């Protein structure tokens, strides 16, 4: 089983961004946490990050994964192109946000991408990724039986 984690713009700057909102952990810490989880669970995982919409769409279009966790970053709020690419992806998928987007500025409260995902986890910090990975792993393994 292969799971894909996609991180959008500015997530590579974790640890340097507003620590009151995003915490003290770095992007490398996040990747390490995800890779450790994958190793403990016997799952192959790829962590992909891009600040460019087209690169994210191209990665999704490869369709070479069994489950998806995506943090579209700011693209969450307006990228109908990523939304359409997600709609093509027919595997379990969860949108994740480190901060609680529903408790922040008005423009951050709308997600155009969540409606084409199985669900959304928001505001649980880096732990939200683990919850999302657990879900996509479980649902992917059940659907492959």
Swiss-Prot record:
Keywords: Amino-acid biosynthesis, Aromatic amino acid biosynthesis, Lyase. GO terms for molecular function: 3-dehydroquinate dehydratase activity. Pathway: Metabolic intermediate biosynthesis; chorismate biosynthesis; chorismate from D-erythrose 4-phosphate and phosphoenolpyruvate: step 3/7. SUPFAM superfamilies: Type II 3-dehydroquinate dehydratase (SSF52304). GO terms for biological process: amino acid biosynthetic process; aromatic amino acid family biosynthetic process; chorismate biosynthetic process; quinate catabolic process. The active site is at residues 22, 97. InterPro entries: DHquinase_II, DHquinase_II_CS, DHquinase_II_sf. It is an enzyme of class 4 (lyase). Disulfide bonds: none annotated. The keyword Lyase applies. The record marks 17 as: Transition state stabilizer. It comes from the Bacteria. Substrate binds at residues 71, 77, 84, 98-99, 108. The keyword S-adenosyl-L-methionine does not apply. It catalyses: 3-dehydroquinate = 3-dehydroshikimate + H2O. Homododecamer. Catalyzes a trans-dehydration via an enolate intermediate. Belongs to the type-II 3-dehydroquinase family. PANTHER family: CATABOLIC 3-DEHYDROQUINASE. This is 3-dehydroquinate dehydratase. It comes from Thermotoga neapolitana (strain ATCC 49049 / DSM 4359 / NBRC 107923 / NS-E). The gene is aroQ.
């Amino acid at each position: 089983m292969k799971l894909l984690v996609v991180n959008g713009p500015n997530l590579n700057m974790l640890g340097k961004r507003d620590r009151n909102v995003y915490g003290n952990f770095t992007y490398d810490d996040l990747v390490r946490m995800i890779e450790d989880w994958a190793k403990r669970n016997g799952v192959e995982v790829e962590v992909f990050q891009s600040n460019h919409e087209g690169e994210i769409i191209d990665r999704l279009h490869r369709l070479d994964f069994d489950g998806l966790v995506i943090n579209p970053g700011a693209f969450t709020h307006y990228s109908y192109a990523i939304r359409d690419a997600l709609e093509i992806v027919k595997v379990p998928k969860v949108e994740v946000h480190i901060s609680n987007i529903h408790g922040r500025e008005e423009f951050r409260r709308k997600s155009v991408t969540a409606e084409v995902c199985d669900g959304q986890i928001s505001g649980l910090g880096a732990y939200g990724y683990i919850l999302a990975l657990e879900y996509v792993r479980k649902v992917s393994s059940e659907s492959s039986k």
